[in-house]
Amino acid sequence: MTTLKGGPTDRDDDDAAAVDYVARARELAPVIAAHADDIERRRELPAGLREKLIDGGFFRLLLPRSLGGAELPPLPFVEVIEEIAKADASTAWCLNQVSGCSMTAAYLAPAAARAVFGAPDGILAWGPGPGEARVVDGGYRVTARFSFASGSHDASWLGAHLPVVECDGKPRLHADGSSVVHTFLFPKSAAQMTDIWHVVGLKGTGSDQYSVEDLFVPARFCVARDDPGARREHGLLYDFSALQLYASGFAAVAMGIARATLDAFVELARDKIPRGAKRTLRDNNVVQSQVAQAEAKLGAARAFLFGALAEITAAVARTRHLSLDQRMTIRLAATFAIHQAMAVVDTAYHAAGATAIFTANPFERRFRDIHTVSQQLQGRQQHFETVGQYLLGLAPDGLAWL
């Protein structure tokens, strides 16, 4: 099986499609799991593991094939992320984040795309934050500060989503009066990185802060991300926006955490006899019911999300258009999966008793990780309100996150 090294190659698209990245993720999972403690302690991916992920093509899952990427459809992509998350949530989180970022390549001119992604370690990361991009000759002057930059320790380039300001200081506006927001890309070496990622869970993502001050960004590294009219790549994947892949991928992280936690509890229940009890956990009727219900929750959430992605991808292949109804379905399935996964982890954690609190056992980190996933934008309860408004025929809020 050909190893994807990241630069453009002369292989056929069919060769890229033939690579079974899910199987490849399963093969690498034991290596990732063996690094899990080190990942958390370092608050980043170790260099050796990063190299293995680069060699396996895992940072380029959503990158166009024209640039040596896999250009995976949504469903196999989230299956890969789920498999990685079973081994380590921080690794899966970083891969999902930078994969979504790499979809920007579909909007860049070929030379600019090669400058960012052409090298094997051509990895792009970004985070949200305030700032502006002022129009100047040949490009823009960017001043901004960004946080939650997952994968930034692995990246060679960083990005910024900012409102455009004209030379005279007036904001550039769309016809409807809303601000024009573009994505600006620049080498990581041009930014000031600040270590702020001291958190409860997903410690290994290194989601630090970065800033730039009056940085000149050439116009060729500015794109109207997710604007269909600006796309140069026309594969099926890019009929979806990064928003749908972020939502689905982070839900897959949650489901991978839940699957691994529940499996670990089932293993524990075979032998553990709680203090004061006469039987093992697995012989306890309450535990039996809890395990069955947890399996049902996780299976239902997974079936909803994966089934929706398969059905919607097939429909988009025919129409080449992602409808609002389809975007709502992905939004609902993704947020639902995160909350069901959290419930499964909570059940397993509490049923494991005092065993779960020791760092040597596989429960406490996953408990912290899932409760960090749920705090991120993708887990917001507000998303249920948005979908509910739509289903009830009301004007939905929160369309920006669809």
What are these regions (language model features)?
Residues 352-402:
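Glycine-rich phosphate/cofactor-binding loops in nucleotide/flavin-utilizing enzymes
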